[in-house]
Amino acid sequence: MKFTVFASLFASAAAFAPAQQAARTSVATNMAFESELGAQAPLGFYDPLGLVADGDQEKFDRLRYVEIKHGRISMLAVAGYLAQEAGWRLGGDIALDGTKFADIPNGFAALSAIPQAGLIQIIAFIGFLETSVMKDITGGEFVGDFRNGYIDFGWDSFDQETKLRKRAIELNQGRAAQMGILALMVHEQLGVNILPGV
């Protein structure tokens, strides 16, 4: 856990170090993704590590899929973390031995408090979702399109401009949630609560 804290501190300190001059890539390569969703103000297209410098669309789509998926998971993680900090808990027992949901602490401490059989069930359920339910539709409308005949929420009733705007909102909120859950985890390990009144 301390390694995670130090790694995040090092990464944030590196943001203020003088930047090295990287080799210039061709304008044509960078232009390949400048009009993609997510290349928004104020940064525009941002690829400091050059992950898609070769202009490979398949690689870009895979990275975008992973970014969207991690963003969605992070949004749920932030909401869950804040709900638990607010005192909202499931009723009943988490295990047959009488351990209640209310007895499970927040954050990393929950991993050691949940019975091993419960952790195995959680991992198995996530594996089931990964392999069977939450799969990117081959030939879907866009990368990260998980509609599988059951999940729609009226998406098909929106016009193209509205769909693009909503996808941009989801992408930005997912990026913010990834930073948010990381900040909550780092501060938890530092023993500093950043939530007001808690």
UniProtKB/Swiss-Prot annotation:
GO cellular component entries: chloroplast thylakoid membrane; light-harvesting complex; photosystem II
InterPro entries: Chloro_AB-bd_pln, Chloroa_b-bind
Compartment list: Plastid, Chloroplast thylakoid membrane
Pfam families cross-referenced by the UniProt entry: Chloroa_b-bind
Membrane topology summary: Multi-pass membrane protein
Gene3D superfamilies, per database record: Chlorophyll a/b binding protein domain
Transit peptide, from-to: 1-31
Keyword flag Transmembrane: yes
GO biological process: photosynthesis, light harvesting
Residue intervals passing through the bilayer: 73-94, 114-134, 174-196
Superkingdom to which the source organism belongs: Eukaryota
GO molecular function: chlorophyll binding
Keywords: Chlorophyll, Chloroplast, Chromophore, Light-harvesting polypeptide, Membrane, Photosynthesis, Photosystem II, Plastid, Thylakoid, Transit peptide, Transmembrane, Transmembrane helix
Role description: The light-harvesting complex (LHC) functions as a light receptor, it captures and delivers excitation energy to photosystems with which it is closely associated. Energy is transferred from the carotenoid and chlorophyll C (or B) to chlorophyll A and the photosynthetic reaction centers where it is used to synthesize ATP and reducing power.
Subunit annotation: The LHC complex of chromophytic algae is composed of fucoxanthin, chlorophyll A and C bound non-covalently by fucoxanthin chlorophyll proteins (FCPs). The ratio of the pigments in LHC; fucoxanthin: chlorophyll C: chlorophyll A; (0.6-1): (0.1-0.3): (1).
Family of this protein: Belongs to the fucoxanthin chlorophyll protein family.
This protein's name: Fucoxanthin-chlorophyll a-c binding protein B, chloroplastic
Organism, scientific name: Phaeodactylum tricornutum
